[in-house]
């Protein structure tokens, strides 16, 4: 029996929990189980604070997100969000009786006010056995990350509602600095792999002036600053066709505008077999120190049509794994959580959407144990590799602690 290791508190991280609406609080609760397990194993303290957003905030606080909640989010190390909104006909009523406030306004305000400019959505098969659940053929081997610009473009441009004239308009606007920073985010992510991943930039440069600026700026940034990276430009309509016909052809990092990213990421969401498997991260800076401020949430909605304990928590748990890696400087823990999720999927410990019979909480209950197991195996492997590395260094006359290139 191994001697018990007494852990001491080495750090404290504040995480704001925005459960949101319908299934949102349920899936957040399962991610918290995993995060508490990580904290216990690592000696890190996670301080959680629950706040309201979306319809829940409208009904209790009169607006989809309050200034007080925004201020608390700004001061946190990271944010986890469940889901916002409900069915199209859901009516949200403020304490003073108004029904004209929409839950989604809270999420848009959160993204804009906290400058969460880069939305990352990984898309891959967690297990080959899930391929048959996808409505698309040829999904095996698919592995890409969509990087969507999140605080610019048509969603935040000048808007003119129909005033009775029968005319309405929305304006798509992008500036060079906005495009530069999202291009650098894509390049950074591509360079985290060996060899570096190709970058795909999606636009509509044959029609839109904003897309021509987008293409010109992305080309310049990657050519001047990241010449080692492969850059491919693709028109958005052509890219949409490729993702249906042969999604693995676009493996790598996909970068695109706010509206195009919104559409293409929803299209890509059918590839893994269920929306309940897709995590996301929205970052305010490059995660070059693994401490970027971010908002982490599943790609699925609030599922108002499903009953309690039926929603797949994996997307939210994988979002927590992304948070560990990008915002909390705990990459090994994030890797262990991802490995545990894949093991659970392989073992069939899943919700009904991907062929299992487990409830939301049953999936969440099992993952902390699997995460600890994956973490121990990873540490053991790294110790073996480190030992071999030191032996090799001694044989070739290098100091055991020196770096090699």
UniProtKB/Swiss-Prot annotation:
One of its GO terms (molecular function) is NAD binding. GO terms for cellular component: cytosol. Pfam families: Iso_dh (PF00180). It comes from the Eukaryota. Keywords: Amino-acid biosynthesis, Branched-chain amino acid biosynthesis, Cytoplasm, Leucine biosynthesis, Magnesium, Manganese, Metal-binding, NAD, Oxidoreductase. One of its GO terms (biological process) is L-leucine biosynthetic process. SUPFAM superfamilies: Isocitrate/Isopropylmalate dehydrogenase-like. Mg(2+) binds at residues 237, 262, 266. Substrate binds at residues 111, 121, 148, 237. Its EC number is 1.1.1.85. It is found in: Cytoplasm. Its cofactor is Mg(2+); Mn(2+). InterPro entries: IsoCit/isopropylmalate_DH_CS, IsoPropMal-DH-like_dom, Isopropylmalate_DH. Disulfide bonds: none annotated. The record marks 155, 204 as: Important for catalysis. Pathway: Amino-acid biosynthesis; L-leucine biosynthesis; L-leucine from 3-methyl-2-oxobutanoate: step 3/4. Binds 1 Mg(2+) or Mn(2+) ion per subunit. It is an enzyme of class 1 (oxidoreductase). Residues 352-371 are annotated as: Disordered. It catalyses: (2R,3S)-3-isopropylmalate + NAD(+) = 4-methyl-2-oxopentanoate + CO2 + NADH. NAD(+) binds at residues 86-104, 301-312. Belongs to the isocitrate and isopropylmalate dehydrogenases family. Catalyzes the oxidation of 3-carboxy-2-hydroxy-4-methylpentanoate (3-isopropylmalate) to 3-carboxy-4-methyl-2-oxopentanoate. The product decarboxylates to 4-methyl-2 oxopentanoate. Homodimer. This is 3-isopropylmalate dehydrogenase.
């Amino acid at each position: 029996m191994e001697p018990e290791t007494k852990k001491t508190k080495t750090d404290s991280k504040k995480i704001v929990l925005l459960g949101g609406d319908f299934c949102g609080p349920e899936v957040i609760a399962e991610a918290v189980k995993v995060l508490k397990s990580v904290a216990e194993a690592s000696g890190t303290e996670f301080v959680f604070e629950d706040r309201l957003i979306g319809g829940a905030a409208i009904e209790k606080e009169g607006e989809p997100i309050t200034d007080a909640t925004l201020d608390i989010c700004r001061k946190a190390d990271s944010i986890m969000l469940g889901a916002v909104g409900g069915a199209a006909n859901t009516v949200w009523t403020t304490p003073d009786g108004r029904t004209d406030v929409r839950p989604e306004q809270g999420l848009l305000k959160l993204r804009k006010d906290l400058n969460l400019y880069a939305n990352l959505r990984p898309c891959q098969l967690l297990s080959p056995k899930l391929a048959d659940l996808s409505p698309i053929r040829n999904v095996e081997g698919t592995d890409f990350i969509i990087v969507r610009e999140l605080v610019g473009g048509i969603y935040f441009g000048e808007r003119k509602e129909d005033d009775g004239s029968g005319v309405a308009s929305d304006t798509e606007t992008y500036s060079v600095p906005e495009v530069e920073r999202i291009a650098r985010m894509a390049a950074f992510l591509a360079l985290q792999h060996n060899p570096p991943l190709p970058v795909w930039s999606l636009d509509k440069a044959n029609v839109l002036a904003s897309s021509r600026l987008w293409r010109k700026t992305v080309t310049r940034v990657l050519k001047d600053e990241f010449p080692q990276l492969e850059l491919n430009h693709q028109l958005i309509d052509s890219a949409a066709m490729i993702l249906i016909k042969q999604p693995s052809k676009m493996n790598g990092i996909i970068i695109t505008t706010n509206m195009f990213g919104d559409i293409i990421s929803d299209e890509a969401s059918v590839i893994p077999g269920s929306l309940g498997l897709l995590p996301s991260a929205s970052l305010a800076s490059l995660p070059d120190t693994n401490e970027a401020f971010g908002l982490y949430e599943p790609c699925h909605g609030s599922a108002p049509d499903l009953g309690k304990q039926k929603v797949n928590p994996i997307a939210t748990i994988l979002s927590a794994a992304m948070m560990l890696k990008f915002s909390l400087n705990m990459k090994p823990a994030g890797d262990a959580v991802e490995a545990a999720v894949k093991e659970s999927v392989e073992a069939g410990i899943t919700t009904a959407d991907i062929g299992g019979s487990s409830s939301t909480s049953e999936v969440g209950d099992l993952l902390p144990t699997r995460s600890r197991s994956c973490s121990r195996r990873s540490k053991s492997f790294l110790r073996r590799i480190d030992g071999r590395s030191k032996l090799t260094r001694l044989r070739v006359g290098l100091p055991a602690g020196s770096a090699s290139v």
